[in-house]
């Protein structure tokens, strides 16, 4: 099994660029930068895309330009065009249930209330069997404050932790292609930014 599509979830536009909900896009942006493969807008895929080589494999990067709750439209368009199966997709997203400074790989599972994941599962024919990169952003402590929290900007101290976790996640994603998922997962799951 090889990953052929890496997606970073986000809301479009400058007003959302620095919000916690865009952590997935921060990850794909960093990966594109590390691999010297600038993202370019591609209307037919409803997002910014790039093509990279990881461990000798041809991989597409995607940051949808749809709103978060419509992310599945972009993912399904690209998966359909390139004949990519759900289990060949890695979706990076913000994760309330992990603290800033932590990121974890996961295969399949429910959407956990995340509107981006919810729409992707739906648009892939109710198939949740894709890989996720869960980027910890922490939780406001009150479920009624979640919307404002994910659409807010993290304080500098938290941003630093999130950035360090994303940096490690990018390294571990590259490692996945050269050394396998188990080794990459073990390394990433042992990491906690200080």
Curated annotation (Swiss-Prot):
It comes from the Bacteria. The record marks 11 as: Discriminates between blocked and unblocked aminoacyl-tRNA. Its main location: cytoplasm. The active site is at residue 21. Its EC number is 3.1.1.29. GO terms for molecular function: peptidyl-tRNA hydrolase activity; tRNA binding. It is an enzyme of class 3 (hydrolase). One of its GO terms (biological process) is protein quality control for misfolded or incompletely synthesized proteins. GO terms for cellular component: cytoplasm. TRNA binds at residues 16, 67, 69, 115. Keywords: Cytoplasm, Hydrolase, RNA-binding, tRNA-binding. The record marks 94 as: Stabilizes the basic form of H active site to accept a proton. It catalyses: an N-acyl-L-alpha-aminoacyl-tRNA + H2O = an N-acyl-L-amino acid + a tRNA + H(+). It is found in: Cytoplasm. Monomer. Belongs to the PTH family. PANTHER family: PEPTIDYL-TRNA HYDROLASE (PTHR17224:SF1). HAMAP family: Pept_tRNA_hydro_bact (MF_00083). Hydrolyzes ribosome-free peptidyl-tRNAs (with 1 or more amino acids incorporated), which drop off the ribosome during protein synthesis, or as a result of ribosome stalling. Catalyzes the release of premature peptidyl moieties from peptidyl-tRNA molecules trapped in stalled 50S ribosomal subunits, and thus maintains levels of free tRNAs and 50S ribosomes. This is Peptidyl-tRNA hydrolase. It comes from Shigella boydii serotype 4 (strain Sb227).
């Amino acid at each position: 099994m090889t990953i052929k599509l890496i997606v970073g979830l986000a809301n479009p536009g400058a007003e959302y660029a620095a919000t916690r909900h865009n952590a997935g896009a921060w990850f794909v942006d960093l990966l594109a930068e590390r691999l010297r493969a600038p993202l370019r807008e591609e209307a037919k895929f409803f997002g910014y895309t790039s093509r990279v080589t990881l461990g000798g494999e041809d991989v597409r990067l995607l940051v949808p330009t749809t709103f978060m709750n419509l992310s599945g439209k972009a993912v399904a368009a690209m998966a359909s065009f390139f004949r990519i199966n759900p289990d060949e997709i890695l979706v990076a997203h913000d994760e309330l249930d992990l603290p800033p400074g932590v990121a974890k790989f996961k295969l399949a599972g429910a959407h956990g209330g995340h509107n981006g994941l919810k729409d992707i599962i739906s648009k892939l024919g109710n198939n949740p069997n894709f890989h996720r990169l869960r980027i910890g952003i922490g939780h406001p402590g009150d479920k009624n404050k979640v919307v404002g929290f994910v659409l807010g900007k993290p304080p500098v101290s938290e941003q630093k932790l999130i950035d360090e976790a994303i940096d490690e996640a990018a390294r571990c994603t590259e490692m996945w292609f050269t050394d396998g998922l188990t080794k990459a997962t073990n390394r990433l799951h042992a990491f906690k930014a200080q």
